[in-house]
Curated annotation (Swiss-Prot):
Its main location: membrane. Keywords: ATP-binding, Cell inner membrane, Cell membrane, Ion transport, Iron, Iron transport, Membrane, Nucleotide-binding, Translocase, Transport. It is a peripheral membrane protein. GO terms for molecular function: ABC-type ferric iron transporter activity; ATP binding; ATP hydrolysis activity. The gene is fbpC. The keyword Transport applies. Belongs to the ABC transporter superfamily. Fe(3+) ion importer (TC 3.A.1.10) family. Its EC number is 7.2.2.7. Part of the ABC transporter complex FbpABC involved in Fe(3+) ions import. Responsible for energy coupling to the transport system. It catalyses: Fe(3+)(out) + ATP + H2O = Fe(3+)(in) + ADP + phosphate + H(+). It is found in: Cell inner membrane. This is Fe(3+) ions import ATP-binding protein FbpC.
Amino acid sequence: MITVKPGCVTFQNVRKSFGAFTAIPDLSLSIEPGTLVTLLGPSGCGKTTTLRMLAGLEHPTSGRILIGGADVTMLPANERDVSMVFQSYALFPHMTSLDNVAYGLQSSGLGKKEAREKAEEGLKLVGLAGMGHRLPAELSGGQQQRVAVARALVLEPQVLLLDEPLSNLDARLRRRVRTEIRELQQRLGFTAVYVTHDQDEALAVSDRIIVMKDGEIAQSGTPRELYEAPASSFIADFMGEANVIPCEVIGVEGTEALIRVAGVDHRLPGRNAKAGMAKLAVRPGSITIAAAGQQGLAGRVLHSAYLGGHVEYEVETDVGTLFIIDHAVERNLPPSSDVTLGFENRGIALINA
């Protein structure tokens, strides 16, 4: 039987330099046992370097890394109680699925019979029972990914590390496999650290998301917290596309704020708002379109694109060009159409300047 012993993860003032370049200046974070935490950010933000330090594939220049309360800072990878699922899956092409899953168990000293029995259990766990005889080339991309997950899980690590595990799959398969990973993590309760640059993927699988920028934590929180209450323009735009609009907070009453955009006043949710200049992050689907001449923000359609279930517009306004998703496909506004824009109460966040 495969059992898990979920461990906590702690980084204490970790710094990582490559020659004169500092990839991680000063990183401190903690991950609770039994949670799936995603390191999210654009290329070069430091998320993969952070994962590699946790795996023991890189060592920090300074600082401490703890797994399950034990200091593993300078331990080699093979002495850490972690398993890693690589972006390429790293399956041995000449071995069957069963042998791939059993390989790590046998390398760690388990007898061949016991290793194969546990490997069969691992394949069953990921929905590949009866497919242990197949070579990697005889499996689909999604099945290969599940073999890689099974190989990692049978070692019963304190922490499972996943490095962009879905990047080699097509969009439809990515959605299915990310659901399978999340269901498996919740069912077994293991600790997982997941690296991706895909915001939708992070929102779908995570208990908590750590967004990184330039080797530092830009914001950490639940998927809902990051999407609905971004701490900066960078977070607002990175966690799903957002229009960032300059505005002025005229006043705040309870949870509602009076906001002025291009001379037009709006009453909108004002979480933690303060009077003064600010920025308004508005999701493309939270901008309303009405006929020209009404009260609101005047604009002119620059471009439109019909995408079946919705129409995408770029509209020029006094506060810049706004990107809008409109589900009223029958509206079908051609370029140069004059319109009036407004804001819904959902999908909007105030960011203090």
